[in-house]
A protein has these predicted regions:
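Aromatic- and carboxylate-enriched substrate-binding clefts and catalytic-loop regions
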Residues: 1-7, 16, 20, 26-52
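Acidic, glycine-enriched catalytic cores built around paired aspartates
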Residues: 2-12, 24, 32, 43, ...
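Acidic, His- and aromatic-enriched active-site or binding-groove loops in soluble protein domains
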Residues: 46-67
Length: 150
């Protein structure tokens, strides 16, 4: 998860920079809504985590089906969600330039590369473990789910 998000952020930052250099408007589609278990994050935090300059005043997002009624079922909640989305995008755009000038990016990048490396190594060790399949079979309804006639 750490490495995937770090690599995605680096790719978006590179594409944003190249777009600026070449005069090409780059637009990203951020599918970050929904439950945390499916990769989602609270709206404000997900937008704040995007690379500086990657929004440029426009933002497109998805909402997973299970959260649509939760967020938009009544007028008050819907107003709050739209305000949160709009203010988060505005904040990201306004702070992107200022923060890029203030943050010693190379130190952050070096730290994230190290964290990402440790994360990737741990993930690969888990995936390559000879005991992983047995653990998953014993701790989840995997075999029962396979028998369901859906």
């Amino acid at each position: 998860y750490v490495t995937a998000n770090w690599e995605l952020g680096k790719a978006q930052a590179t594409m944003t920079r190249l777009g600026e250099e070449l005069g090409v408007k780059i637009a990203f589609f951020h599918g970050r809504g929904g439950s945390v278990s499916r990769g989602g994050a609270p709206t404000g935090r997900a937008i704040a985590a995007l690379p500086a300059g990657s929004i440029r005043g426009g933002f497109r997002s998805t909402e997973q089906g299970e959260v649509v009624s939760y967020k938009y079922a009544n007028r008050g909640t819907a107003h709050y969600q739209v305000e949160l989305l709009a203010s988060s995008v505005l904040q990201h755009v306004l702070l992107s330039e200022r923060e890029s000038a203030l943050v010693p990016k190379h130190e952050f990048d070096e730290a994230m590369e190290a964290i990402s490396g440790v994360s990737w190594t741990a993930y690969r060790q888990l995936m390559e473990s000879e005991h992983l399949l047995a653990y998953l079979q014993g701790s989840s309804p995997l075999e029962e789910l396979a028998l369901l006639n859906i």
